[in-house]
Structures are given as C-alpha cells and as structure tokens.
Amino acid sequence: ATLLDNLGLTGLAINSTTNPGIISYWQKFNKNGFAESSNHRSYTFRKGIIVPKRLTVSHRDDARLEFDVVPIFDGTNNAIVVSDAASLPTIAINPARWTLGPITLGNEVLTEYTQLEIDFGNTVETGSSESDIDPTHVAVRTHEPTITITGIDPQWMSSSVFALGGTVVAQATDAIYLRKRSGVSFVADGTAEHIKLTPNGILSVGQAAQAEAQRIGQTTIMVKLGIDSSGNAALAVDTTSAIS
C-alpha cells in the first residue's frame, strides 16, 4: 500500500536535489560468515525514475508489486554509483500483507477466481546527446494498463455473465479488492485498511477454456483499461478502503 501511494500508477521521479535518491545494498558474505560492517556493496541511483511494472496475487498468496528503477546522469555522478565500502543500514520491516478479495467486473460478481495480474503498461524511454555515456533524460512514454484474471468457473463465459464478445467495465459499478491480512485471519471488511482498485475499460475473453486430463479447467478474462468519456482515469487506487 505504501509503494502504491508513493509511486502512483506511472512512477515517481528520483531527484538528488530534493532527496538522496535510491540506494541498493548487497551484503558481502565470506566463507565463514558475513563480512565486516563497512565492506559491503552499494549501488546509488541519484536521479531517474522508479516505475511500477505489475501487481500480482494468487489464491492464498500475498500480493506482490514489481517495479523498475531507471537511473540517469545527474550532471555530476554516473547514473549508477558503486561502492564496496558500504555499511548496511537497519532494515525496517512492514508486516502488512494483502491477498485476493472480492471482484466485480461488468457489474457481475466473480466467483472461483484464483489469480489476478495488473500490468501497469508503463513504457519508459531514456535518451542522451553530445556523446554522453549515461542517459541524461527519461520519461514514461505510454501508460496502457491491463488486468488479467484467471479462474476455475466456466460459467464466466455464458450469456448470463460475460458473452464471448466481452463487456464494458466502469468505475461506477466495478471494483477489485485486495483484502488485508491480520495474523492468520483478515482485517474486518468494514475497516478501511483494504486496497480498492476501480477500473475503466473493455473486458474481453483471454481464454474461454483450458483443461487437461484429470485437471481442473481454467478460464481467463482480460480488461484493457482506458480513460472513460468523462475523463476519469483508467484505474483508480484507494489504499484505505472498506470492503463493500
């Protein structure tokens, strides 16, 4: 939730004049244990962009957010500054976790879904000039998010749910929830700590049916997201939502 709040859907600029950038630490391991406190490696990215790539969550698993860091030359330092004399910081661990929650698409309540993937569709382009070795500018050129949902209910593809021709998905009627965990159970539905994603777009059949001998068949639907006629965003995210 914190990453989604900070990155948004199209990324966050890294600027060394207003923040220290991003540092990735690599702990050195000797044959008989870890190295001394100041002999580890670090990679520092002082300027660039950090961009969300995809969010995935499967039945009984925790949601995962993947992102890319695209560094550029900041005018003084290389795009990536390497040090082999780094001291490791104290790592802060956030125990918050989310998993699959209720899903409504095309004003239909889905059942028997097993996997959700949101590809944020961010295409990043870097460039430079004057024979610079490192890239000197970066931009998100396109943002074309898609949602893929896999389930084991063949009735998704029926006249009473989703026809093979697909249907419209709208923020006014549809939502995807990520349910927050609490120990071995879940946070109460009425507590505003869940994640709600509301999409606009067109739902289509990704794979009407896939099955093997003695295996449960699967069905896949895809939602191509886009801005609606009122100018609402392709996908809205609320990280402090109750489930309704």
What are these model-predicted stretches?
Residues 1-244:
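Signature of extracytoplasmic/envelope-associated structural regions
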